[in-house]
Every structure is written in C-alpha cells, then in structure tokens.
C-alpha cells in the first residue's frame, strides 16, 4: 500500500511542499530565512492573539491595558516583549531574505518575487499599525506624521487623510480601526505566503551558483528539515536573549510616556526597521517628492528583473557586482543610522548623499557593472 502521506488529499500537499520536495543539494544558510519568516509569523500571530485578549483599543485605556498586561497578567511581560522583539526579528529575517534574493538573482522567478514585494509592503503596514496600539507618545505622533504624508497626494490627499483618521485628528476612531487592521493583516500575510510558496514550487528553488540544479536534487526531508530546525533554534536563541536581557534595546524611550496631543516629542522617529526609508523621506525637502521617494525605495524591488543585464543569474562569479552589492548594504546601514538622527548639519547632507547613492546603485551602477562583466567574459 502507498504511504498515506502520498495519497491523503491534505497530507500530500504537505508532503509535496515539505517532505518529498526536490531541493538543490547546494543551497546555503541564506536559504534558511524563508522558513524563519514562517516561524516569525506564527510566533507573532500566537503572541498577538494572547495580547489581544487583554488589550483594549480605546484612547483612554489602551496605554493602561498594556501596562496591565506587563504587570498583572501571568507572563504578560514576556508575551508583550516577545511580540515587540519578534517584529524586529521578523524584519531582520526579511532584510536578509530580500538581500539573498538580490545577490543570487532569485528575482528571476518574477511571480514569487512580486508576491514577496507585496508581502514586504503588507508586513511594513502591519508593523506600523501595531506600533500605534500601545498609545505612547511615539505611537501617537508616529501615526500623525506617517498618515499625514497621504495629504501630499494631489486633490484627494486631505480628504483621504481625514477618512483614514475617522475625524480631524488621530483619535479613538483611528486607534480602533488600526487595531482591527493589525489583527486581520497577519492572516492576509499568511495567505500571501502560501501563494508565495505555491509559485516557488512551480519552479523550484534557486541556488548560490544561479545554474539549474535539476541534475542534482535531494529530498527536502531530512536534509533541509534538520537545517531549518537548527536555524529556528538560533532564531529563538537570539529572540529570547533580547527579550530576557534587554527587551527595550530596540525600542524608543519616547514611547513610555502616554500619548499627549498637546506635547510634540523633540525627535519623531519610527522603529529601527523603518529608519532607512524614513531617512530617504526626510532627505527630500518637498513633501510629495519625499513620499514618492519613500514608496519607490521599496517599490524599486519590482524593477529588479528588468534591471538585470548580466548573462549570469547569480553574483557568485561577478566580483564588480559583489562589490557594489556590499556598498548598497553599507549605504542602507548609513541611511538607518541617519534616520535616527536629528535633522541638522551634517546629518542632512549625509542623508541626501546616501539617498542619491541608493537609487544610483540600483538603477545605474549595478546594471552598468553587469554589462562590463559581460564584456570581460569575452576576453
């Protein structure tokens, strides 16, 4: 009799995705981040569910309810900090995952890549709305500043902002709807992740060489299941070290005072994982221009397959492109640092130069380097 995992309507889906899936024999640890993102998502949904049991989405009690979770609920503090730092781990894995895709040319699988970009946008939207929920100073002012950016849209901007706010300022209606959206979005992300996986399994995984691995495949289980478990253990180790030893390391102290509409914090800044985009936004003196640059800084990923001019898929054998890739990483780290600094000399000019460099690298320098490398192959 055939094994039940190969015949059962539900089990065979799991079997074909996680057990008997033919995988390249040479994929490195950079291919671990997909499964780690899945673990992060499950962890966020579970901790979020337990937080939602004790949280109240009302301007008068939201802050107190979070305090109540940390002080009075059994292990509430650990659930709250696992959720907050889980978001940071989520974004670390996301950035690594996207970086891997850029380096090894995984964007050639266009459907998988484009759904990945949509997933990135959805995750950023979810994290932003989640940051508003504790209703601290930075929650309130962050929500005010970021939603206000939509007013830069010509003609409909102001109406759009007031429609999102549910009034003439960020208030009870805004908090309630953000909670509703923050609750539903992770499930939309989970559904999109399934589609992401569906498209990936149509083509199979890429590998570090960028060459077809059809001639040399191994079963996903046990080889990559055990590898993913090791990755998961390391992820949990890092997360729990953060949670148990320095839970507020990545947070902003300005979010500890409760929201006060009459008092603006001296430096409004988002969580660390948005700082690079925030720096690009701030480096353009024009409001609409800044908003466009902000959106394009992520949306530019969609253009990656079109900007690929190399005859080789991966950067593994392309030293000039490798060099530019790591300059891009350094540039993004610079932008992240600038995003957390006040708007004054010399930070303004550094931010503007780093922003120009970001778009220049992706749109001009990297395609040029690929063309040069193609010509070098002829020698």
Curated annotation (Swiss-Prot):
Record GO terms (molecular function): metal ion binding; ubiquinol-cytochrome-c reductase activity
This protein's name: Cytochrome b
Recorded name of the encoding gene: MT-CYB
GO biological process: mitochondrial electron transport, ubiquinol to cytochrome c
Transmembrane segments annotated in the record for this chain: 33-53, 77-98, 113-133, 178-198, 226-246, 288-308, 320-340, 347-367
Domain of life per record: Eukaryota
Assembly: The cytochrome bc1 complex contains 11 subunits: 3 respiratory subunits (MT-CYB, CYC1 and UQCRFS1), 2 core proteins (UQCRC1 and UQCRC2) and 6 low-molecular weight proteins (UQCRH/QCR6, UQCRB/QCR7, UQCRQ/QCR8, UQCR10/QCR9, UQCR11/QCR10 and a cleavage product of UQCRFS1). This cytochrome bc1 complex then forms a dimer.
UniProt entry tagged with the keyword Isomerase: no
Sorted UniProt keywords: Electron transport, Heme, Iron, Membrane, Metal-binding, Mitochondrion, Mitochondrion inner membrane, Respiratory chain, Transmembrane, Transmembrane helix, Transport, Ubiquinone
Naturally occurring in which organism (per UniProt): Cephalophorus ogilbyi
GO cellular component assignments: mitochondrial inner membrane; respiratory chain complex III
Major site of localization recorded for this protein: mitochondrion
């Amino acid at each position: 009799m055939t094994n039940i995992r190969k015949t059962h309507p539900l089990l065979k889906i799991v079997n074909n995705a996680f057990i008997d899936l033919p995988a390249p024999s040479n994929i490195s640890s950079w291919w671990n981040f997909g499964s780690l993102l899945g673990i992060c998502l499950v962890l966020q949904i579970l901790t979020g569910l337990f937080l939602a049991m004790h949280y109240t989405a009302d301007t008068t009690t939201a802050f107190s309810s979070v305090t109540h979770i940390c002080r009075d609920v059994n292990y509430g503090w650990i659930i709250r900090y696992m959720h907050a730092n889980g978001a940071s781990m989520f974004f670390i894995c996301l950035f690594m995952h996207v970086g891997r895709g850029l380096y090894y040319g995984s964007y050639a699988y266009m459907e998988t890549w484009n759904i990945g970009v949509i997933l990135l946008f959805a995750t950023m939207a979810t994290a932003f709305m989640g940051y508003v929920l504790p209703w601290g100073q930075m929650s309130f002012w962050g929500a005010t500043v970021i939603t206000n950016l939509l007013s830069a849209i010509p003609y409909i901007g102001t109406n759009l902002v007031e429609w999102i706010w549910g009034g003439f300022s960020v208030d009870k209606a805004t908090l309630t709807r953000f909670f509703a959206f923050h609750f539903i979005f992770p499930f939309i992300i989970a559904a999109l992740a399934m589609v992401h996986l569906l498209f990936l399994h149509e083509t199979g995984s890429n590998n570090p060489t960028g060459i077809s691995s059809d001639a040399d495949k191994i079963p996903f289980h046990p080889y990559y299941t055990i590898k993913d478990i090791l990755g998961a253990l390391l992820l949990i180790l890092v997360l729990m070290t953060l949670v148990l030893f320095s839970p507020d390391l990545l947070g902003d102290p300005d979010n500890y005072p409760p929201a006060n509409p009459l008092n603006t914090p001296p430096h409004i800044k988002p969580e660390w994982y948005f700082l690079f985009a925030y720096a690009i936004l701030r480096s353009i003196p024009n409001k609409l221009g800044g908003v466009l640059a902000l959106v394009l800084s992520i949306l530019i990923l969609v253009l990656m397959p079109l900007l690929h001019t190399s005859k080789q898929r991966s950067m593994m054998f392309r030293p000039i492109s490798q060099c530019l890739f790591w300059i891009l990483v350094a540039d993004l780290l610079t932008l992240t640092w600038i995003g957390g600094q006040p708007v004054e000399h010399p930070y303004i000019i550094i931010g503007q130069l780093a922003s120009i460099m970001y778009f220049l690298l992706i749109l001009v320098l990297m395609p040029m380097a690929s063309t040069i490398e193609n010509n070098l192959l002829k020698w």
